Swiss-Prot record:
The lineage of its organism: Bacteria, Pseudomonadati, Pseudomonadota, Gammaproteobacteria, Oceanospirillales. The keyword Transmembrane does not apply. Its cofactor is FMN. This is Pyridoxine/pyridoxamine 5'-phosphate oxidase. It comes from the Bacteria. Homodimer. It comes from Chromohalobacter salexigens (strain ATCC BAA-138 / DSM 3043 / CIP 106854 / NCIMB 13768 / 1H11).
Length: 215
């Protein structure tokens, strides 16, 4: 199978991004860009690629949804017993990528990862649709299963178990917070002369530095 995709390209012409105009905190710039993405992207502005590594150093990536953002970092929720959960237990670092094609913008993030508090996970779980709450019990994420009937049978079983009762959060399900130490903002520009601004966190000074990178 051979696809000729060498000619797949587009022109870029976004807003100018400079070190001088960028705020001191990258999370402030992230919030500004994220608000614009929510306004202009057709759907899933909070979708982000999450990359982790296993115990052998092999990378694995998948798309997850950003569900909370605060001064500490970015939060997503998942099954702690999944492949990514196991990888984050062994190597508690991750990379994130947001891509917003309408705005011609990308944000790349690297950071340390910690579990969100039980209070944060409980509060988010309580606001999920009931079917999604049950799904957290039904699916043994990343485990090989024989067929879809296996899922449907577990669905019926848990619906009977809970009936009209409140569905509690499973102990194996909850949030992770990515604590960034690097953020890179990319803005598409004409002639492939794109704008790239990189922030690094310096723990000793408890401060961010920012610099411009060649495209």
């Amino acid at each position: 199978m051979n696809y000729d995709i060498a000619d797949l390209r587009r022109d870029y012409a976004g807003e100018t991004l400079s070190v001088e105009s960028a705020p001191a905190s990258p999370l402030d710039l992230f919030q500004t860009w994220f608000a614009a993405a929510r306004e202009h992207e057709t759907q899933d502005a909070n979708a982000m690629t999450l990359a982790t590594v296993d115990s052998q150093g092999l990378p694995h990536a998948r798309v997850v949804l950003l569900k909370q953002l605060d001064d500490k970092g970015l939060v997503f929720f998942t099954n702690y017993q999944s492949h990514k959960g196991s990888e984050l237990t062994n190597v508690p670092y991750a990379a994130l990528v947001f891509w917003w094609p309408t705005l011609q913008r990308q944000i790349r993030i690297e950071g340390r990862v910690e579990k969100a508090s039980a209070e944060v996970s409980d509060a988010y779980f309580a606001n999920r649709p009931r079917d999604s709450q049950l799904g957290a019990w039904i699916s043994q994420q990343s485990v090989e299963i024989p067929d879809r009937d296996w899922l449907e049978e577990r669905k019926q079983r848990f619906e009977q178990v809970y009936g009209e009762q409140t569905v509690e959060r499973p102990p194996h399900w909850g949030g992770y917070r990515v604590l960034p130490f690097l953020l890179e903002f990319w803005q598409g520009q004409p002639n492939r002369l794109h704008d790239r601004i990189r922030y690094r966190y310096h723990e000793q000074d408890a401060a961010w530095s920012k610099t411009r990178l060649a495209p």
